[in-house]
């Protein structure tokens, strides 16, 4: 459950480490795995592709809140994380760190192909 003003980890190598959610593009008050949000970079690494304070789009790949699957199993992660994307939905980085939950079919296949582990 990601809301406005939520501080999130970045799960790719685009150069950002922490981002702040400043808007939701799903028309609801909260976002979950697979939703696209608008973020502002707060903590960056030197020589990265992104700049501090700039606004980007991101897709949520991990949430702390437990997500129930259709078979009854529950998936819960230890952090809220996003992957920065461009306007076409392609990731800005070339690697995705950590496990991610399976994203909606066909929407973010490039992000899922870069992930090491998809749950």
From Swiss-Prot:
SMART domains: Ribosomal_L14 (SM01374). It comes from the Bacteria. Keywords: Ribonucleoprotein, Ribosomal protein, RNA-binding, rRNA-binding. GO terms for biological process: translation. One of its GO terms (cellular component) is cytosolic large ribosomal subunit. One of its GO terms (molecular function) is large ribosomal subunit rRNA binding. The keyword Cell membrane does not apply. InterPro entries: Ribosomal_uL14, Ribosomal_uL14_bac-type, Ribosomal_uL14_CS, Ribosomal_uL14_sf. Part of the 50S ribosomal subunit. Forms a cluster with proteins L3 and L19. In the 70S ribosome, L14 and L19 interact and together make contacts with the 16S rRNA in bridges B5 and B8. Binds to 23S rRNA. Forms part of two intersubunit bridges in the 70S ribosome. NCBIfam families: rplN_bact (TIGR01067). Belongs to the universal ribosomal protein uL14 family. This is Large ribosomal subunit protein uL14. It comes from Ehrlichia canis (strain Jake).
């Amino acid at each position: 459950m990601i809301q406005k003003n939520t501080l999130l980890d970045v799960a790719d190598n685009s150069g950002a480490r922490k981002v702040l959610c400043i808007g939701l593009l799903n028309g609801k008050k909260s976002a979950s795995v697979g939703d696209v949000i608008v973020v502002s970079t707060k903590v960056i690494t030197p020589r990265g592709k992104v700049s501090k304070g700039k606004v980007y789009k991101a897709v949520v790949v991990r949430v702390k809140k437990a997500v129930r699957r259709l078979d009854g199993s529950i998936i819960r992660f230890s952090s809220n994380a996003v992957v920065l994307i461009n306007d076409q939905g392609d990731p800005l980085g070339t690697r995705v760190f950590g496990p991610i939950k399976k994203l909606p079919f066909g929407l973010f296949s490039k992000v899922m192909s870069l992930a090491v582990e998809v749950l």
